[in-house]
Amino acid sequence: MSFFSHHPSRSPRIWTDILLRWQGSVIPAIASRVLVCMAFSLGVTLVDGWGYKFSIPIQESIVPSIVLGLLLVFRTNTAYERFWEGRKAWGTMVNTIRNLSRIIWVSVAEPSPQAHQDKIKILHLLVAFAVATKLHLRSQPLNEEIWALLPESGYRKLEDLNNPPLEIAFWISNYLQREYDQNNINAYQLTAMLRLVDTMVDVLGSCERILKTPIPLAYAIHLRQLIFLYCFITPFQIVNTLHWATAFVVGIIAFTVFGIEEIGVEIENPFGHDANDLPLDQICQTMQANLEDLIQLPPWHQISHGD
């Protein structure tokens, strides 16, 4: 399945499958909090049943409810903006690597068989840049995915670096400059290709900015404190009316507000392994498949109007 085709369908069958889906749901993350609120509500109900009556007018919660709702909306929107910015950055990465690989394959002259092999190696380096960026964003060490794309000497050099994608970008730029010095590309082609390399590095920087600029801690703490206060005050407002149904209703309210807040937590860092993160593994695999297809095309001097 392509990474473009995993979106929910409008089919009733698919809708039901998503409704009942556990993987990717926030239920496991919020279940304990919801149960705590329900247990507290049950305690309030028991105390109320013993004759200790509570009376907090429900009208007094209207303003706090609106404020909490606005805070939750802001929290979720901010997290989704980070998620979407990460997706756009990786979309730019895909397009840039496709464009640069196409230009290199078609435009760089091949005066010798070794030059052809060098072009293949540089296309693999383009995919290696994407894979290294993925691993860098996940704080993972280099693995066999990178090993398959690089010569052993290159892999060993990257092992000792804090930012392998930057080193790979340097290698790509160095290759392009060398081809220009050998008159295999002209100045205009060199400039165009170096701009694409710059775009790849810009994407890396954008992703690092998303990763290293979390939601302010004070905001996250205050929002969670407000959510707990809201869920703990609600039983006192409804127990006289709902009695033993209080815990159930509070559970629904807690599930709603904690769930919305947890969605923001899930998607604010879109570069991990979770079901709600970007499918970076699939994106990298797609790029590699695209470049392997490109390598199967005839060399630049054999191409004639698509024949």
Swiss-Prot record:
It is found in: Cell membrane. Pfam families: Bestrophin (PF01062). GO terms for cellular component: plasma membrane. Its main location: membrane. Keywords: Cell membrane, Ion transport, Membrane, Transmembrane, Transmembrane helix, Transport. Signal peptide: none annotated. GO terms for molecular function: chloride channel activity. The chain crosses the membrane at residues 26-46, 54-74, 226-246, 247-267. It is a multi-pass membrane protein. Belongs to the anion channel-forming bestrophin (TC 1.A.46) family. This is Voltage-dependent anion channel-forming protein sll1024. It comes from Synechocystis sp. (strain ATCC 27184 / PCC 6803 / Kazusa).
